[in-house]
């Protein structure tokens, strides 16, 4: 019997912890799949340039049409397309799985029930920016944002591997590009456009606090998923 596929979005601003959370959920829920929106970045030459600087943190830096097509493929076929299966674990940071091995052990079956559904976890920073994308997910999780924490985490990163090279943020990149890009893509989801405030869109579940530990985020996400599947 073919299991029903449930697509679970895990979104949030850059450095909100969404990728770590997605990796841990993938490790906890046996038989699940993992998709990274980052795999849909455009080539380096296609990244929009604003004020002479490449803007990797705007919607236009991603091929969202291809991303949506792949989500529809997963919905229709119940499996990841070959090119995503081949990349499924390439963006996984093994150090995170080692660092949080105790959390995986705590929540892994039999601590949680074995599900009849095939869960596909999708992590990305621009996943709820329009209705077509929002509707592509069955469960929509979002990590709450905190400007100062995100800025500190982003500026602590050494850089990013791109399709064709390596990118390192220039000074003041977070406040001039990363944060404005996130606000532009998500303000429509929040009361008065305040992305640090309350959600207007009840289809999306927002984590209770930006101060939650990794374990608390995992607990919240698992509870949200299991409740949605009831």
From Swiss-Prot:
Intrachain S-S bonds: none
Classification via InterPro entries: P-loop_NTPase (IPR027417)
Residues the record lists as binding ATP: 12-20, 153, 157-159, 203-205
Pathway: Cofactor biosynthesis; NAD(+) biosynthesis
GO molecular function, a single term: nicotinate riboside kinase activity
EC number: 2.7.1.22, 2.7.1.173
One GO process term, biological-process aspect: NAD biosynthetic process
Enzymatic reactions: beta-nicotinamide D-riboside + ATP = beta-nicotinamide D-ribonucleotide + ADP + H(+); beta-D-ribosylnicotinate + ATP = nicotinate beta-D-ribonucleotide + ADP + H(+)
Domain of life: Eukaryota
Binding-site list for Mg(2+): 19, 38
The keyword Hydrolase is assigned to this record: no
Record: active site: 38
Key word Thylakoid present: no
Annotated GO CC locations: cytoplasm; cytosol; nucleus
Entry keywords, A to Z: ATP-binding, Kinase, Magnesium, Metal-binding, Nucleotide-binding, Pyridine nucleotide biosynthesis, Transferase
Binding site for substrate: 38-41, 56-57, 154, 159-160
Family: Belongs to the uridine kinase family. NRK subfamily.
Alphabetized PANTHER family for the sequence: URIDINE KINASE
Role description: Catalyzes the phosphorylation of nicotinamide riboside (NR) and nicotinic acid riboside (NaR) to form nicotinamide mononucleotide (NMN) and nicotinic acid mononucleotide (NaMN).
Record protein name field: Nicotinamide riboside kinase
Protein species of origin: Schizosaccharomyces pombe (strain 972 / ATCC 24843) (Fission yeast)
Encoding gene (name): nrk1
